[in-house]
């Protein structure tokens, strides 16, 4: 995705934090980056950085760099951060495009990424528990690996002037602008219902008024 949108990319700056998830994600990125020997991997490691030092490092990134936002919850000082940390990083790199493999920063910073295609697995886990209970002799592993899906933020795509059609695979667009009807469906139907009630009330009132006028001369 990155090379399709930015073919001149030479550096990938990967951001990960000081948690098990961050370390695991960094190990996966290191492994996958071996498939792209022409790209230089710059590690923004939360085990060696605080939020302040990593912001300074981001400001010093070389040209033709793309940021890959893994996760950021805990820094080297074991300080816990919410979304404000990634906002600070975003403000430090306004001209550098960012992507994510984890959905972190998607919707306000990252343009898109390849994300896990999560689904409800409660039923599958229950069936597997029943199977293990009924067939204890079956020691085989019946694992289902969750796949991935390509996602793009439609607002960021428009902001950066990108064209999803250049991608050689299907992509899901999120945060697409909704129509006036979709945004105010409840209010529109409520107004229509109120209008119908008022019209019916008016018709009934006029009907009874006409009956009164008709009956008056006969008195």
Where in the sequence are the language-model features?
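Residue-level detector of conserved catalytic or cofactor/ligand-binding positions
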Residues: 210-218
């Amino acid at each position: 995705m990155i090379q399709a949108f930015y073919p001149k990319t030479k550096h990938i700056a990967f951001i990960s934090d000081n948690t098990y998830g961050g370390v695991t994600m960094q190990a996966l990125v290191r492994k996958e980056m071996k498939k792209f020997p022409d790209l230089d991997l710059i590690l923004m490691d939360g085990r060696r950085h605080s939020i302040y030092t990593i912001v300074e490092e981001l400001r010093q990134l070389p040209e033709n760099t793309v940021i890959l936002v893994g996760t950021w919850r805990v820094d080297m000082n074991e300080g816990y951060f919410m979304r404000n940390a990634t906002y600070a990083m975003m403000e430090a790199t306004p001209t550098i495009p960012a992507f994510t493999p984890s959905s972190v920063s998607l919707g306000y910073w990252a343009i898109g990424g390849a994300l896990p295609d999560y689904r409800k697995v409660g039923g599958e886990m229950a069936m597997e528990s029943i199977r293990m209970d009924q067939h204890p002799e079956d020691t085989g592993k019946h694992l289902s690996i969750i796949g991935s899906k390509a996602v793009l933020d439609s607002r960021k795509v428009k902001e950066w002037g990108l064209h999803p059609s250049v991608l050689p695979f299907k992509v899901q667009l999120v945060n697409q602008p909704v129509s006036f009807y979709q945004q105010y469906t409840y209010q529109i139907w409520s107004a229509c219902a109120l209008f119908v009630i008022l019209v019916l009330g008016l018709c009934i009132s006029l009907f009874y008024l006409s009956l009164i006028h008709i009956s008056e001369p006969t008195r």
